[in-house]
């Protein structure tokens, strides 16, 4: 009787390629797995079990070395059983009737427990799934990760070599006193805005005046202000586009929409910018080409002090380390925009109802889709980031007022910046 090579012990499951057909070691039929310590088909598995339970004694009618195949395996039970034993099948692996019953009961119990767990596990409702899908689509439509539009801004000018090559950690120090900010605050009081803002709801966002580049180059300490002013104006337009697609946002009055957009714009821009923020040594915002890699020194050249930049970098690092899913990121932006506690909101109840739907969706998503340990206290950490943004918004407002009240810097700003930040609500 011809023998085929077969293992008599349980192999490592990783040794088998799922795409390679497995062959029964007894008859050569397609094997379904390891049964009683050998690779066999269902037919030979059942034959061996029945034979062992009955303690059957078979006699070969021929010379005791019949070749067993799929077609003739029923012809000689003696040689078939001998073949089963030769390839390593063991009766010790056969369960008794009681053991079989216990195993069935355990399997049934496990299935019932899994079904109960599944029924108790939070699931996204159809409405919540629609909210997430809508926000993802809105974000993809309003955030270009190729940053191709940046070439349309006034060009970045980095002509201050003494700061340009300084590493981030030499600029951001725990002992920073913030003198530049305090000195600015000395002469930038909370006097009313001198510029009359245009109508926000009717403004053509694509028509913004640009200043003469020759004037920009004369003020090296503000060399990056024209470029970053255009960048922020561009980002505001994108935030507006995103907000309009938030489910429920268009149900608000135009007045409340404007209030929410004006008060949250810079916060959402800071949230959006986390996508391009890198945790390298220089901790920069990388937006495509080297020309659009923004470091701390670039922000200082736009007139901002470390009183804003230090907490901004800390915020960006903390947010990046949360490793948010894109779904969580867009929900956080929407929650940030639709905040009922913004000063000037008229229908706070409706705004709160919209925000509650978004918040509930975020919490359910985290429980359903964000595996531990990253999900631990994640919602609370995200809400804390919104509180951090309020502080950043307040500091940005102070520093923006300093810029807007100085003729040499205000002339670098855009009409949209004056409209959104020039008539500060918060």
Swiss-Prot record:
UniProt-annotated binding residues for Zn(2+) 1: 24, 27, 41, 44
Q: Where is the composition biased (Low complexity)?
A: 175-191
**Tissues of expression:** Mammary gland, expression increases during lactation. Also found in colon, expression is down-regulated at parturition.
Specify where the region named Hinge lies, as residue ranges: 97-126
Post-translational modification remark: Ubiquitinated by UBR5, leading to its degradation: UBR5 specifically recognizes and binds ligand-bound VDR when it is not associated with coactivators (NCOAs). In presence of NCOAs, the UBR5-degron is not accessible, preventing its ubiquitination and degradation.
Q: Which residues bind Zn(2+) 2?
A: 60, 66, 76, 79
Which InterPro entries does this UniProt record tie to the protein? DBD_VDR, NHR-like_dom_sf, Nucl_hrmn_rcpt_lig-bd, Nuclear_hormone_rcpt_NR1, Nuclear_hrmn_rcpt, VitD_rcpt, Znf_hrmn_rcpt, Znf_NHR/GATA
Supply the alphabetized keyword list: Cytoplasm, DNA-binding, Metal-binding, Nucleus, Receptor, Transcription, Transcription regulation, Ubl conjugation, Zinc, Zinc-finger
Zinc finger (NR C4-type) stretch: 24-44, 60-84
User: Under the cellular component aspect of Gene Ontology, which terms does the record hold?
Assistant: cytoplasm; nucleus
Biological processes annotated in GO: cell differentiation; intracellular receptor signaling pathway; negative regulation of transcription by RNA polymerase II; positive regulation of transcription by RNA polymerase II; vitamin D receptor signaling pathway
Molecular function (GO) terms for this protein are: nuclear receptor activity; RNA polymerase II cis-regulatory region sequence-specific DNA binding; zinc ion binding
Stretches assigned to the NR LBD domain: 127-422
PROSITE patterns membership: NR_LBD (PS51843), NUCLEAR_REC_DBD_1 (PS00031), NUCLEAR_REC_DBD_2 (PS51030)
The UniProt entry lists the main location of this chain as nucleus
Q: Where is this region: Interaction with coactivator LXXLL motif?
A: 244-262
Q: Which family does it belong to?
A: Belongs to the nuclear hormone receptor family. NR1 subfamily.
Share what the entry says about its subunit structure, partners included. Answer: Homodimer in the absence of bound vitamin D3. Heterodimer with RXRA after vitamin D3 binding. Interacts with MED1, NCOA1, NCOA2, NCOA3 and NCOA6 coactivators, leading to a strong increase of transcription of target genes. Interacts with the corepressor NCOR1. Interacts with SNW1. Interacts with IRX4, the interaction does not affect its transactivation activity. Interacts with CRY1. Interacts with CRY2 in a ligand-dependent manner.
Function field = Nuclear receptor for calcitriol, the active form of vitamin D3 which mediates the action of this vitamin on cells. Enters the nucleus upon vitamin D3 binding where it forms heterodimers with the retinoid X receptor/RXR. The VDR-RXR heterodimers bind to specific response elements on DNA and activate the transcription of vitamin D3-responsive target genes. Plays a central role in calcium homeostasis. Also functions as a receptor for the secondary bile acid lithocholic acid (LCA) and its metabolites.
| The protein, known as | Vitamin D3 receptor
What is the species listed in this Swiss-Prot or TrEMBL entry?
Bos taurus
Gene name, Swiss-Prot/TrEMBL: VDR
